[in-house]
Amino acid sequence: MAKNKGVRIVITLECNECRSNPAIDKRSHGVSRYTTEKNRRNTTERLEIKKFCRYCNKSTTHKEIK
């Protein structure tokens, strides 16, 4: 029998500063992305977490894109 997938889904977090600003004041070119899981029942809205961006070389807010 197949197992139920459950309520946890895989999401992608993307740096807000890398996306909005061009390559000004950056260590290198690119957009920082992290993948993580979230519980759909507990967190229905889009997730926003402060994480380290290796392109900006500082901690920035990362927002859920998918």
Curated annotation (Swiss-Prot):
Pfam families of this UniProt entry? Ribosomal_L33 (PF00471)
Gene3D superfamilies of this UniProt entry? Ribosomal protein L33 (2.20.28.120)
Q: Name one GO biological process term.
A: translation
Q: Which UniProt keywords apply?
A: Ribonucleoprotein, Ribosomal protein
| InterPro entries listed in its UniProt record | Ribosomal_bL33 (IPR001705), Ribosomal_bL33_CS (IPR018264), Ribosomal_bL33_sf (IPR038584), Ribosomal_zn-bd (IPR011332)
Cellular component, GO, one term: ribonucleoprotein complex
For molecular function, the Gene Ontology terms on record are: structural constituent of ribosome
Q: Which domain of life is it from?
A: Bacteria
Indicate yes or no for the key word Heme. no
Q: Which family does it belong to?
A: Belongs to the bacterial ribosomal protein bL33 family.
Q: Which HAMAP family match?
A: Ribosomal_bL33 (MF_00294)
What protein does this entry describe?
Large ribosomal subunit protein bL33
Source organism (scientific name) = Prochlorococcus marinus (strain MIT 9303)
